[in-house]
C-alpha cells in the first residue's frame, strides 16, 4: 500500500478478471494469513506443484552430465505426479471507468483491456504494438508524447501479460493531478492513430530492429534467458532459436499491428488513483 504504482496494477487485474481465480490479490490479508498452518501450506504445494507442470532449466558453462546429476540429486527421489484440477477461463467483463480517492501526491492511471493468451498467433503483433506504445526505449510513442514533448508525466509504460487461457494489456502513467486528463487525451489520440493508420515500411523496419536488439541484449542475462527458456518449453514444448524468433518478427506486417490495435483497444477500461 506504500506504492500506489504497484497497488493500482493489483487492483486493475482484480477488476479486469473479476469473478475468476485470477481476480483476487494473491498476497492475502492479515486474517487469511493468520489461518494458514504448515499443514495447509504443505497441502497447497502437493496439490499445485506437480511434476507434469515442472521444467528444469539451466543456462551456463556447465556440462550436461553435471546438470543432470544435480537435478537427479534434488528431484530424482520425488514420485511423478499429475495436476488434477484446471482453471476456468475468466469470463469477459464490461468495460469500466473508476476513480478512487487515495489522497496520493500524483494521479496514477491504468488504461487497459483483456488480450490474447500465450498460445495465440497474434501475440507477436501485439507484443510489437505494446513495445511501440510504451516499451523500455526512450523513443516509445507514449514516452515521447507525454514526457519528452509535453513534460506531463515522468513515468509511463505499456505491458502485455499473456496467460495460458487469457491475457491483459495495460498502459500506465503517473502525473500531477491537473495534467491527468490531458495525458488521457494524448494516449487516446495515439491509440486512435495506431488503430486507423498502418505504420510506414521504414518505421516498421526500425521498430522490428529495435525489438530484436532488445531481445538479443536480454539474452545476455543468463538468469533471464534461463527463465525464458524454461517457460517456453513448459508452455510450448519447444524453445525457439534466435534465428527462428528473427524470422517470426520479420514476418509481422503493418496491417496486422493495426488490426490488433483495433481489436484490443477499441474498448478499454480505466482505473484512476488520485
Predicted regions and their residues:
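Charge-rich, well-structured scaffold segments of protease-associated domains
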Residues: 1-83, 89, 99, 109, ...
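Phosphate/diphosphate-binding glycine-rich loops and adjacent basic-rich segments that engage nucleotide
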Residues: 94-105, 109-113, 121
Amino acid at each position: 500500500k506504500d506504492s500506489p504504482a504497484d497497488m493500482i496494477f493489483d487492483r486493475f487485474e482484480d477488476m479486469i478478471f473479476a469473478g475468476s481465480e485470477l481476480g483476487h490479490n494473491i498476497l492475502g490479508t492479515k486474517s487469511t494469513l493468520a489461518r494458514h498452518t504448515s499443514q495447509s501450506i504443505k497441502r497447497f504445494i502437493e496439490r499445485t506443484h506437480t511434476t507434469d507442470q515442472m521444467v528444469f532449466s539451466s543456462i551456463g558453462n556447465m556440462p550436461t552430465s553435471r546438470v543432470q546429476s544435480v537435478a537427479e540429486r534434488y528431484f530424482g527421489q520425488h514420485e511423478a505426479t499429475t495436476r488434477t484440477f484446471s482453471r476456468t477461463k475468466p469470463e469477459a467483463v464490461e468495460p469500466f471507468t473508476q476513480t478512487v480517492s487515495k489522497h496520493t501526491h500524483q494521479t496514477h492511471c491504468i488504461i487497459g483491456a483483456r488480450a490474447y493468451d500465450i498460445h495465440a498467433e497474434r501475440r507477436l503483433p501485439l507484443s510489437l504494438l505494446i513495445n511501440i506504445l510504451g516499451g523500455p526505449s526512450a523513443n516509445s510513442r507514449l514516452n515521447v508524447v507525454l514526457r519528452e514533448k509535453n513534460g506531463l508525466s515522468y513515468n509511463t509504460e505499456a505491458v502485455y501479460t499473456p496467460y495460458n487461457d487469457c491475457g491483459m494489456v495495460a498502459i500506465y502513467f503517473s502525473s500531477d493531478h491537473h495534467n491527468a486528463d490531458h495525458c488521457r487525451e494524448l494516449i487516446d489520440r495515439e491509440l486512435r492513430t495506431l488503430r486507423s493508420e498502418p505504420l510506414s515500411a521504414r518505421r516498421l523496419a526500425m521498430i522490428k530492429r529495435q525489438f530484436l536488439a532488445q531481445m538479443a541484449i536480454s539474452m545476455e542475462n543468463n538468469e533471464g534467458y534461463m527463465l525464458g527458456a524454461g517457460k517456453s518449453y513448459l508452455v510450448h514444448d519447444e524453445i525457439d532459436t534466435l534465428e527462428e524468433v528473427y524470422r517470426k518478427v520479420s514476418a509481422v506486417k503493418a496491417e496486422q499491428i493495426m488490426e490488433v490495435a483495433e481489436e484490443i483497444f477499441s474498448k478499454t477500461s480505466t482505473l484512476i488513483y488520485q
